[in-house]
């Protein structure tokens, strides 16, 4: 497919996703909104597959089939009352994907120099940081909604200072990552990843189980911004648009 066709397909998908959000906002149009979302995703996947940038089909297709089958089984088995749990665990997948895309993007494009390197590294560290919080926070939210983790808030002494310390630590190591190359840069990025995972756990553990539906909405927003960051790293316009839609709607 030519770049023009791919861009057109992505634009159509973006419009369908917007229509999907509009349809899902009301019960009487929810079914139609869901269909819009399905159609938009099918177009996006096909456009990406035939973009000429995908080569390892022998690995990709089986993984897509496995994911599709697992998703269909979960959607069929999960009761509507347990839908927040399913949404929470799906958010964790988005966060994990953003972390892996960020690390892989750095390893593939570590030879950037100058302004290009700075911009790319900022995209990477933001994607990894937001993705890490989304992943670990969503796993905890899933556990609390399911009852596997106590719904009682875990209120550690000085928890706000601890959160601030982790945030400042992430900024420091992110700065070190941007201003380093090779193994030191990778080590700093992995430290940011670890801090974000711990921060996600600590943030959600401090919230009671009764407030988890609100937390899921917040994590929905986080997953959107993580996807948008991944879109910048992959230079994928549709991923940026979709991530921004999800992030703002969350």
Functional labels for PLM-detected ranges:
Residues 1-57:
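N-terminal transmembrane signal-anchor/hairpin module of polytopic inner-membrane proteins
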Residues 1-14, 51-69, 120-135, 182-195:
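Structural signature of hydrophobic alpha-helical transmembrane segments
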Residues 10-23, 41-48, 95-101, 105, ...:
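Helical transmembrane-bundle signal
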Residues 48-61, 73-84, 99-115, 180-181:
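Transmembrane alpha-helix boundary signature
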Residues 80-136, 140-159:
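Interhelical loops and loop-helix junctions of multi-pass membrane transporters/channels
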């Amino acid at each position: 497919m030519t770049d023009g066709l791919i861009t057109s397909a992505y634009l159509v998908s973006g419009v369908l996703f917007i229509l999907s959000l509009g349809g899902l906002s009301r019960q009487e149009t929810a079914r139609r909104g869901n269909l819009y979302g399905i159609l938009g995703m099918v177009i996006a996947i096909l456009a990406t597959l035939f973009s000429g940038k995908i080569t390892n089909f022998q690995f990709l297709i089986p993984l897509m089939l496995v994911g599709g089958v697992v998703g269909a089984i979960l959607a069929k088995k999960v009761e509507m009352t347990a839908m927040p749990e399913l949404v929470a665990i799906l958010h964790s997948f988005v966060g994990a994907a953003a972390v892996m895309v960020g690390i892989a993007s750095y390893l593939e494009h570590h030879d950037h120099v100058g302004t290009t390197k700075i911009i790319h590294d900022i995209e990477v560290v933001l994607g990894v940081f937001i993705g890490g919080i989304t992943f670990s926070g969503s796993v905890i939210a899933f556990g609390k909604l399911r009852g596997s983790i106590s719904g009682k808030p875990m209120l550690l002494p000085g928890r706000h200072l601890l959160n601030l310390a982790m945030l400042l630590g992430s900024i420091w190591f992110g700065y070190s990552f941007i201003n380093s190359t090779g193994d030191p840069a990778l080590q700093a990025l992995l430290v940011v990843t670890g801090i974000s995972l711990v921060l996600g756990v600590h943030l959600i553990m401090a919230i009671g189980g009764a407030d988890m539906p609100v937390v899921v909405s917040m994590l929905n927003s986080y997953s959107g911004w993580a996807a948008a960051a991944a879109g910048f790293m992959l230079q994928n316009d549709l991923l940026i648009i979709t991530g921004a839609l999800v992030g703002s709607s969350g």
